[in-house]
UniProtKB/Swiss-Prot annotation:
It is a lipid-anchor. InterPro entries: P-loop_NTPase, Small_GTP-bd, Small_GTPase, Small_GTPase_Ras-type. It comes from Dictyostelium discoideum (Social amoeba). Keywords: Cell membrane, GTP-binding, Hydrolase, Lipoprotein, Membrane, Methylation, Nucleotide-binding, Prenylation. The gene is rasB. Alternates between an inactive form bound to GDP and an active form bound to GTP. Activated by a guanine nucleotide-exchange factor (GEF) and inactivated by a GTPase-activating protein (GAP). This is Ras-like protein rasB. It comes from the Eukaryota. Gene3D superfamilies: P-loop containing nucleotide triphosphate hydrolases. The keyword GTP-binding applies.
Length: 197
């Protein structure tokens, strides 16, 4: 089985939302019970996404509040992002706007491949964020949305595969426009770049 594509995925979100639990469940098929704050961990997994054999290079990052100096660097190198919040934490859900804005600022592109992930959906009795709220936020961002449970292994593979699909989709879009620093749109015309303000 030869690998045709390699993708760099970055898992982002607040501290304690289950980024490491999701990533380790995806890579090693087991659930980590104890919370040990991550600085930065990198994992690789070869897998089949639709018809393609892919090598996923996954960066499990520190929570939003920690280690912000490294954040811009891994946002620059990432191709696709899982923006994870905890359905039992309204605060982590509200932080997602900031996470997305940081990604868009660093990538200088508002069409970055992102999947919104509401983790810990097995803790229904502690839920603070409804599935409908997650779905509405994803719709406002124009990104896919999944609720997951790292503990029960619900939608774990699917959320990573969905990011790969979003990356593939973005790579197929010809001449995607990019916002410049002043808010204009750069478009390719014969003879060079033009700035439309």
């Amino acid at each position: 089985m030869s690998v045709s594509n390699e993708y760099k995925l970055v898992v982002m979100g607040g501290g304690g939302v289950g980024k490491s639990a999701l990533t380790i469940q995806f890579i090693q098929n087991h659930f980590i019970e104890e919370y040990d704050p991550t600085i930065e961990d990198s994992y690789r997994r070869q897998c089949q996404v639709d018809e393609d054999t892919c090598l996923l290079d996954i960066l499990d990052t520190a929570g939003q509040d920690d280690y912000s100096a490294m954040r811009d660097q891994y946002m620059r190198t990432g191709q696709g992002f899982l923006c994870v919040y905890d359905v039992t934490s309204r605060t982590s859900f509200e932080e997602i706007n900031v996470v997305r804005e940081q990604i868009i600022r660093v990538k200088d592109n508002d069409k970055v491949p992102i999947v919104l992930v509401g983790n810990k959906c097995d803790l229904e009795n502690l839920r603070e964020v409804t599935e409908g709220e997650g779905s509405e936020l994803a719709k406002s961002f124009s990104v896919p949305f999944l609720e997951t449970s790292a503990k029960k292994r619900l939608n774990v593979d699917e959320c990573f595969f969905e990011v790969v699909r979003e990356i593939k989709k973005s790579l197929k879009e010809p001449g995607r426009s990019k916002k410049d620093k002043k808010g204009g749109i750069l478009k390719k015309f014969k003879g060079g770049d033009c700035l439309i303000l």
